[in-house]
Swiss-Prot record:
Organism in which the protein naturally occurs: Psilotum nudum
EC number: 2.7.7.6
SUPFAM superfamilies tied to this protein: beta and beta-prime subunits of DNA dependent RNA-polymerase
Similarity comment: Belongs to the RNA polymerase beta' chain family. RpoC2 subfamily.
Encoding gene, per UniProt annotation: rpoC2
Gene Ontology biological process terms, A to Z: DNA-templated transcription
Protein name as catalogued: DNA-directed RNA polymerase subunit beta''
Catalytic reactions of this protein: RNA(n) + a ribonucleoside 5'-triphosphate = RNA(n+1) + diphosphate
Length: 1408
């Protein structure tokens, strides 16, 4: 007894729940259940006594918070603000921001949870919360963490993680927002309690149904296979691996060096498990129900221990029912929460590598490649193991970073202690899938993008644009106003208006006929609160008139010179291509101006042509297209003249760049007799040979002569002649292009392109002619698709297009030593087809600043959109007695004001005066003539006076009249208040169709509108003279004239401001003497998009993102914008320049996510795995692995056997993956289940195969489910093999595809199953427990099992004869004597005889 006590272990440590379990297990193994029960009673009594003496109670003060919580949360919030800032800058998109935010808060919560346990142990080890939770008595670590740590991230009703974490804990109390977020989980918890019990019960029923017939029938089935257990060095996983090893049986011997430490078929106890883990052997093979020979029973050694008794399982044990209940019963402990993150987070913290001290890091830059992390940050990935060293003055630290890891710092960068320098990749590659996430606009505005897109070919009629390169999407701020159909806006483009202003007015329809009568409407005053205005609409009548107006003028800068020798105007254009955030400069290209003298071009006309000398040839030959793709529609080349357009030749638009080839060769047509031909057919000539008395060949080569009607065609084909050894294959390679390196015949190869042509001589000899080929490339994208104009607009487009001048197979003949161009690059004018624009006028404009002359090509669009409006006559112009405007406005202009402006008269009701506010417009058309008629204020009903006008409208007279009449009745104290409220703006322009002597169109050069007041300064240009409107400002009745400032940016990026002073002759020069130089603006330009934080000036950065819409010496105007990052593969759902409302779909991002990271817990995950849902990765992988293995194995083994080996390999791998995934779900909930229970279930799910059509025999139909052992036996017996593939059946489907129709009918679909069984004539062999219970027989388990009965009879026989069984051979002999000889012992027996006798008393026997 003392010796036994010495062998016992002595425990002297604090024991928690896990340690108590281990102690009880050791006590049962050492003393048995009876002695263990007595010991545990004493332990229970001791526990209650100590608890009473301690008087442990739980108070709110016992909930101790970790001191590190404050700075952890502060650090997470700081990182969150950095993420938000990067998102505003456009550095990361919404998915990357959400992913990083979730991972940051999850890591913060986990670190706080890890700090909680040491905090309790250090501050108060006897804390009641600490003793209760961490001893395992009540409460988990997660629950205590919510009490004293932070609740962390929660999910919404759809299961998506909310990016707003709950920072507080239950001890501190929750805010209102945090409480509402918590209610999501609380509601789901209440539902879980009511539902999960029924779900778990149904799961248990299905599990028991599929394995109810599995019983332990034999001691050893003879299986030599096993499953591997890979040992780990991770101390956190050692206990898990030890528990999984205990109770198993070894499938092979285990050796330590040359010594055997464990034998096959030896069961693994606690000591052996510890020893196997200690020696850290890589692989240990153990027997498993997955590798048993039979699918209908299991042996003792494959099953292992019965964990209840810690000994080998007894024969006749119904281990299938035990397995089903062991898996289903813990389902009540699981949650039903479908807690997923949309794929942005997997629930694991990545392993980081940190450095121990400050220093400079260095590594080989050639071994790393740049990459974008899942958070959108730049990093470098190493393809192999990377050696990294950190140096400072005193120490050097070397570390090896595993391959495929991310390097987060640059080479030779200074790093600080504990800084993360690398992130190690996950060891196992998780399956991924590509998903889409819609990004919605959170503001109204106008859409722009700065990336490369293309129109989706699948959505030709919609606005879907795939992104080809990562870039930004900009939403320029703006508010959309809904205007009713019968209203139009007071304001035009670029107008400024007050928020309280009336925005719309009733529409004056241009195509309506009849009389429109004035109506009075009560409106809110624009400028003074509390006053009302009477709104009166113009009345129109009389005749119909037509008015035309100029549409738009655009400029772009180019160098222009005139070639006097060829009488051509040459434009030197320098295209600028944008690449990411940089501009790529290209050399100047010369384009020959192709416009007529009148400068009028239609849509699609060629503006200029550039001929690249690389595509110019000087010899005759044939054109052959390669990968070049052209438009099927042939366009005629048109050279415009003054009166008409002459058509000659054809041109073919290049749709896709590629290569084409030119085959040199001469062609001559001789109309004389053959006697004049000095060369013979199929002869070889050299260059300079006389062909006829008048023709000399320019090339050398083979001569081909054909008789064509009354003439002869003579071809000179240069090349080399080759005679093949065998002729039969010549037809396959006749008249075709051969690329370099390709074998032609007889292993003949060329290092350049050739054109192979087979020729048969008159003597019936065939030879090959390898003709030389010149390859040309047309690179689509060498020019920008659209030329950048100086003014941003969407109407006019000047496009670069490449044209081929000859079609495929066309012969080109050179005469008189001329040269021919093959490819031309053209500038084409283009605008919308539905636009009223019918033509465009081009002209050349020169601008001189000091001594520098700049040349601009100006394009003015003309339209013929006619407004047919009744000639107007004001029935009532004003409410007051004086018509001050009528004195100054001619009748012709008066009618046009009613058309374009539809001027609105507002009169103040409590005064006897009126004031007029006309909305400014820069597109007003004024049809001027030399004589104008106007109304006199004294005779306003018809007396006419002649006013000779000099083709422009004097606004100064209007201003004076306005001041005189309108302000005469206004008090001085009220004059200042009306400043910037009253203004008359109009534009002096002309009709393009009117033939005025000396009139030329110049256009707008783009000056800065003053924003100091509400006046605009449009201008008109006539007869080489420029006139500007002079605005009228009402301030102390002092009028002044103001010309707008013009701004130019020179080559040194300096801004100059000047006024227009002098005009020079008839040449188109603008000249000024005085230029004032302003501060340098090094980074921004007009129209440029800038991000928040971008540097505007040397000492100033932008605090907002937006677009620069105005530059001034004193300020910048930035239109606010919201930018979004669109990565490659994303989809834009709107056109460029579209107006969006808040909530509209903006872009769709495409990204990868882990398939296994969607649902990480709960019964739904278990059911998804056990039912083999289509979303389950194992269901897809079993078929994918089968195909991959079959392709590889088929290279070494014949096709039929490759199917069988592939099915075996893929099935075994899928079984192991499915066991690990099911076990992972339960372990994530803290539930421990033995692997052998799950393995029994999984074996039944993978026990069948699906027959295929390939080589099918007449035994089974295609698509029929059969057992795998049965298929293997049939293949051994039949001459014609059965082809099959593995399949993963769910537990429900597996229960309905068994050998027992009684079991199937009692489970589901009773009527269908019984009907089909009756039609087929099925036989139920009553192998399972359920079938025997239904018919009232003895269940084949326990004492009803035949093996158990034989074992009991054998024990009785042994006691009677007192025989000792020394080995397995004598034991078998006694079985034979018992069955056959009834007491006579025989030393010879056959196993088949025993099986034959076992079949007699019962109707069936288990088969392998």
């Amino acid at each position: 007894m003392m010796v036994d006590q010495i062998k016992l272990l002595f425990y002297n440590k604090m024991m928690d729940r896990t340690a108590i379990k281990q102690l009880i297990s050791r006590l049962i193994a050492q003393f048995g259940i009876t002695y263990t029960t007595n010991i545990l009673d004493q332990l229970k009594t001791l526990g209650f006594k100590q608890a009473t003496n301690a008087s442990v109670s739980l108070g709110i003060d016992d909930l101790l918070e970790a001191p590190s919580k404050a700075w952890l949360i502060q650090d997470a919030e700081r990182q969150g603000s950095i993420f938000e800032q990067h998102h505003r800058f456009g550095s990361v998109h919404a998915v990357e921001k959400l992913r990083q935010l979730i991972e940051t808060w999850y890591a913060t919560s986990e670190y706080l949870k890890r700090e909680m346990i040491p905090n309790f142990r250090i501050i108060d080890p006897l804390n009641p919360v600490h003793m209760m939770s961490f001893s395992g008595a009540r409460g988990s670590t997660s629950q205590v963490h919510q009490l004293v740590g932070m609740r962390g991230l929660m999910s919404d009703p759809q299961g998506q993680i909310i990016d707003l974490p709950i920072r507080s804990n239950l001890r501190e109390g929750l805010s209102l927002t945090e409480y509402i977020i918590s209610c999501y989980g609380a509601r789901k918890g209440v539902v879980d309690t009511a539902v999960r019990t029924s779900d778990a019960g149904y799961l248990t029923r299905r599990l028991v149904e599929v394995v109810q017939h599995i019983v332990v029938r034999k001691m050893d089935c003879g299986s030599t296979r096993g499953i591997p257990f890979k040992m780990t060095q991770d101390r956190f996983k050692r206990n898990l691996y030890q528990q999984r090893l205990i109770g198993r049986v070894l499938a092979d011997n285990v050796y330590l060096e040359m010594r055997c430490i464990a034998m096959r078929n030896q069961d693994i106890g606690n000591e052996l498990a510890n020893r196997l883990i200690t020696i850290q052997k890589q692989l240990v093979y153990v027997r498993s129900p997955l590798t048993r020979k039979s699918i209908s029973w299991v042996c003792q050694l494959c099953y292992g221990w019965s964990l209840t008794h810690q000994n080998l399982v007894e024969l006749g044990e119904a281990v299938g029912i035990i397995a089903g209940q062991s898996i289903g019963e813990p389902g009540t402990q699981l949650t039903l929460r479908t807690f997923h993150t949309g794929g942005v987070f997997t629930g694991d913290i990545a392993e980081h590598i940190r450095i121990p001290f400050n220093g400079i890091i260095s590594f080989a830059e050639d071994s790393v490649h740049p990459i974008r992390t899942r958070h959108g940050h730049p990093a470098w990935i190493c393809q192999d193991n990377l050696s990294v060293s950190v140096k400072n003055k005193n120490r050097i630290h070397n570390v090896i970073i595993p391959y495929q890891s991310l390097i987060l710092v640059q080479n030779n960068q200074y790093v600080e202690s504990k800084q993360v320098i690398a992130e190690v990749r996950i060891n196992q590659s998780l399956p991924k899938e590509r998903v889409k996430k819609h990004i919605y606009s959170n503001s109204e505005g106008e859409m722009h993008w700065s990336t490369i897109v293309r129109h989706s070919p699948q959505h030709r009629q919609s606005n879907v644009y795939p992104v080809l390169k990562t870039g930004h999407i900009w939403i320029l701020s703006g508010s959309l106003c809904n205007v009713i159909e019968t209203s139009s806006s007071f304001y035009k483009e670029q107008d400024r208006f007050n928020i309280q202003s009336v925005f719309t007015k009733p529409e004056f329809l241009p195509y309506s006929f009849g009389r429109n009568k004035g109506e009075k409407n009560q409106l809110t005053n624009l400028h003074k609160k509390g006053q009302e205005l009477n709104h009166l609409k113009f009345d129109s009548s009389a005749t119909i008139k037509t008015y035309k107006f100029p549409y738009l003028t655009s400029l772009f800068y180019c160098k222009i010179r005139k070639d006097k020798t060829e009488n051509k105007v040459i434009l030197s254009i320098k295209p600028i291509q944008r690449r990411n955030k940089y501009y790529r400069k290209t050399p100047y290209r010369d384009f020959v101006f192709q416009t007529p003298t009148n400068g009028i071009l239609n849509r699609g006309d060629i503006l200029a042509i550039h001929e690249n000398p690389e595509y110019r040839i000087h010899i005759s030959g044939v054109i052959k297209y390669g990968t070049l793709k052209i438009d099927s529609i042939v366009e005629n080349e048109r050279i415009p003249n003054d009166r008409e357009k002459t058509t000659f030749g054809s041109r073919y638009k290049v749709l896709r760049g590629g290569n084409f080839f030119f085959l040199p060769g001469e062609i001559y047509i001789v109309h004389e007799s053959s006697a004049y031909i000095l060369v013979s057919n199929n002869s070889i000539v050299q260059a300079g040979t006389q062909i006829t008395p008048t023709l000399t060949s320019q090339l050398g080569g083979l001569v081909q002569i054909k008789n064509i009607q009354k003439s002869f065609e003579i071809r000179i084909l240069p090349g080399t002649i080759h005679h093949p050894k065998r002729i039969p294959s010549i037809s396959k390679q006749n008249n075709m292009l051969i690329p370099p390196g390709q074998s032609v015949f007889d292993n003949l190869k060329f290092d350049h392109w050739i054109y192979l042509q087979w020729i048969t001589s008159p003597r019936k000899k065939t030879f090959a002619l390898a003709r030389p080929v010149i390859e040309y490339f047309v690179r689509k994208g060498s020019y920008p698709p659209i030329l950048n104009l100086l003014k941003e607009q969407n109407t006019l487009r000047v496009k670069f297009l490449d044209y081929m001048l000859y079609e495929d197979g066309e012969e080109i003949q050179i005469k008189n030593n001329m040269s021919i161009q093959l490819v031309q690059t053209c500038l084409l004018l283009d605008w919308e087809k539905k636009s009223p624009i019918k033509a465009a006028k081009t002209s050349i404009l020169e601008l001189r600043i000091n001594k520098i002359i700049k040349t601009f090509l100006q394009i003015s669009l003309l339209n013929s959109f006619d407004f047919y409006v009744k000639g107007s006559k004001f029935k009532r112009f004003f409410n007051n007695k004086k018509s001050f405007v009528a004195d100054s406005i001619p009748k012709t202009l008066e009618s046009q004001l009613s058309i374009k402006h539809q001027g609105t008269i507002r009169s103040v009701s409590n005064r006897k005066t009126s004031f007029l506010v006309l909305s400014p417009s820069d597109s007003f058309q004024n049809s001027l003539s030399t004589n104008f008629q106007y109304y006199d204020s004294k005779n306003r009903y018809g007396k006419k006076k002649e006013l000779k006008w000099n083709t422009f409208f004097d606004t100064k007279k209007v201003s004076r009249s306005l001041k005189k009449n309108y302000l005469s009745s206004i008090k001085d104290s009220e004059k200042r208040s009306l400043n910037s409220k009253v203004g008359l703006t109009s534009v002096s322009s002309f009709d393009h169709t009117r033939q005025l002597q000396g009139m030329k169109i110049l256009g707008l050069l783009g000056y800065l509108y003053s924003i100091a007041n509400c006046f605009l300064y449009p201008k008109g240009i006539f007869r080489n003279e420029v006139f500007f409107h002079r605005d009228s400002s009402i301030d102390d009745l002092v009028g002044f004239d103001k010309l707008p400032n013009w701004y130019f940016l020179d080559e040194n990026r300096k801004i100059y401001s000047f006024h227009l002073r002098n005009l020079i002759g008839k040449r188109f020069f603008y000249w000024t003497r005085n230029l004032s130089n302003f501060n340098e603006i090094p980074l921004v330009n007009l129209g440029q998009f800038i991000c928040e934080g971008a540097r505007l000036f040397e000492n100033q950065i932008s605090s907002q993102s937006g677009q620069i819409i105005a530059l001034s010496p004193e300020f910048l105007i930035i239109r606010l914008a919201k930018l979004y990052l669109a990565t490659k593969g994303a989809t834009i759902h709107n056109h460029y320049g579209d107006l969006l409302r808040e909530g509209d779909t903006l872009i769709t991002l495409t990204y990868e996510r882990f398939k296994s990271g969607d649902i990480i817990q709960g019964l739904p995950k278990v059911e998804q795995l056990l039912e083999a849902r289509s979303v389950n990765a194992v269901s897809r992988n079993i078929e994918d692995n089968f195909k991959k293995c079959n392709r590889v194995i088929a290279k070494f083994i014949e096709s039929p056997w490759s199917f069988f080996f592939s099915a075996k390999i893929s099935t075994e791998q899928s079984r192991k993956d499915l066991v690990d995934q099911i076990q992972g779900v339960y372990q994530s909930q803290g539930v421990q289940i033995s692997d052998k229970h799950i393995e029994i279930i999984v074996r039944q799910m993978t026990s069948k195969v699906l027959t295929l059509e390939d080589g099918i025999a007449t035994v089974f139909l295609p698509g029929e489910l059969i057992e795998l052992p049965r298929a293997q036996r049939m293949n051994r017996a039949l001459k014609q093999l059965i082809y099959y593939k593995p399949i993963l059946l769910g537990i429900t489907k597996a229960s309905l595809n068994t050998t027992s129709f009684l079991s199937e009918a009692s489970f589901q679909e009773t009527t269908r199953v019984l009907a089909r069984a009756a039609i087929r004539g099925r036989i139920d062999w009553l192998k399972g427990l359920k079938e025997n219970v239904i018919i009232g027989g003895i269940v084949p388990t326990g004492t009803g099992s035949r093996e158990v009965t034989c074992q009991m009879d054998l024990e009785k026989h042994k006691k009677g004869s007192n025989l000792k069984i020394k080995n397995t051979h004598s034991f078998s002999c006694e079985i034979k004597d018992l069955l056959f000889n009834h007491g006579k012992v025989s030393l010879t027996f056959k196993r088949s005889n025993i099986h034959r006798e076992l079949k007699k008393p019962l109707s069936e026997n288990d088969s392998d």
